[in-house]
Amino acid sequence: MASFTATAAVSGRWLGGNHTQPPLSSSQSSDLSYCSSLPMASRVTRKLNVSSALHTPPALHFPKQSSNSPAIVVKPKAKESNTKQMNLFQRAAAAALDAAEGFLVSHEKLHPLPKTADPSVQIAGNFAPVNEQPVRRNLPVVGKLPDSIKGVYVRNGANPLHEPVTGHHFFDGDGMVHAVKFEHGSASYACRFTQTNRFVQERQLGRPVFPKAIGELHGHTGIARLMLFYARAAAGIVDPAHGTGVANAGLVYFNGRLLAMSEDDLPYQVQITPNGDLKTVGRFDFDGQLESTMIAHPKVDPESGELFALSYDVVSKPYLKYFRFSPDGTKSPDVEIQLDQPTMMHDFAITENFVVVPDQQVVFKLPEMIRGGSPVVYDKNKVARFGILDKYAEDSSNIKWIDAPDCFCFHLWNAWEEPETDEVVVIGSCMTPPDSIFNESDENLKSVLSEIRLNLKTGESTRRPIISNEDQQVNLEAGMVNRNMLGRKTKFAYLALAEPWPKVSGFAKVDLTTGEVKKHLYGDNRYGGEPLFLPGEGGEEDEGYILCFVHDEKTWKSELQIVNAVSLEVEATVKLPSRVPYGFHGTFIGADDLAKQVV
């Protein structure tokens, strides 16, 4: 997430929680630190329970741990030499602005942070960041790696480079990609920061200076932080012209490129090196064709090979644009979709002939900051609706809007057409309260897997929970269907069991017709994230494997599980050399596609 000064958005991710950890040796603990120790300008900092290897003393204390959980001691790292060079004017301006920020921080210290912006909650336990990990090969495997799995599994996540100065939401962290490569019957692992423009500048400055969209931009102090950022930009201390995003949410492999994405910027191309390492190529604008941001969940049509995407703006009209790319990367003209107000549109869906655009009740109202509130607002007076637009429309004049009251789906898992009833069927997880991820709420979060039917003839909609038995309802968030059938009718969805929220205790294989649920649980004190379904070579929809990172909070070890998607039995477990924090979305790049990678 980046500042709301340009297009900003948020990704479907869960919040931090409190965890405990066992004593660790110094060698085991090294992967629990932040990134390398870096020079830092003198400043007043808010005293937090989260400390970092970036600062002295070199210890990382996880907040709100049990009394028998000691501090984790890490070795200080050598300081980087590539610090930002400033002229006399810039040094003077930086000192003055740092002093102003110190005053602002001292003011913020007088007010308690909500849980949704409290670093001691948001990046506690296995939500905390890790160091980069160079490639480690020939990892231990329990069981046998399936012969058909050849390629690399990559997963994105938020991993803040620096200790938060004030408020921090889990979504605010810098992007880090974790990669497990399968080759010659063995597995390797690496993780690297995506070196965004924001990341590179903050690394040079040795401190966080870009505004955090959720953790910091609230009320008058949020406005003050924006003004500080503008002033630093005017003085040449920071340069937002080449992007302010974190690239921490989605991943897509398209036209020979792996793209890391967040809604607040252009995508970043990340290269998978021949030995399984990760290297940031740079900000990718599709050869000069993409001039706006792009949401983190573009869709690749499995039949045509085209990429479909949206871009939304929270400041100026048009608030929403739709576009597509041909398989060779040629972009279509933008289709401007008229909205009355800027709206959070984290995800959307495609069918064979249409794009399905959710216009829901979580909106951006920047004037709320003037009144002391959050700019991310649940608008109870707005009626949620879905727009159905022809995939190849040249404008939005024929978009058909269908109301779907009180429906907020952070993610849409699939959609398809049923011509016999003139309906478009949408599968999504309906979340209540809609803004609970961003704003504190007394109501427990619920995420109900739902079937939404949009009748193109009558303009009416219906919605039903797919799991009809109320006693069997569980929070289902983060997952997918068979990607080879995206936009076509699917029988199964594979979704994270987001319980106890915000942790993920396993995943569910759900029959979308009958509501039957089969669960794979990770076990006591073991949690994971989004399950990735990797289709097999056979003809059955559910033939294949499910890949998921799992972390044991008792042993403080992480692994990659490979689960048979039919039987839900674990076929192999790859033991990882360092901790993998809970994260967001991933994808799999087969060996054949990897061989065609653009470098």
From Swiss-Prot:
Keyword presence, Transferase: no
Spans traversing the lipid bilayer: none
Tissue: Localized in roots, leaves, stems, empty silique envelopes and seeds. Expressed at the point of organ attachment and the abscission zones in the plant.
Chain segments annotated as coiled-coil in the UniProt record: none
Keywords carried by this UniProt record: Abscisic acid biosynthesis, Chloroplast, Dioxygenase, Iron, Metal-binding, Oxidoreductase, Plastid, Stress response, Transit peptide
Transit peptide per record: 1-40
Assigned EC number: 1.13.11.51
Names of required cofactors: Fe(2+)
Regulation of its activity: Inhibited by abamine and abamineSG.
UniProt-recorded name of the protein: 9-cis-epoxycarotenoid dioxygenase NCED3, chloroplastic
Higher taxonomy: Eukaryota, Viridiplantae, Streptophyta, Embryophyta, Tracheophyta
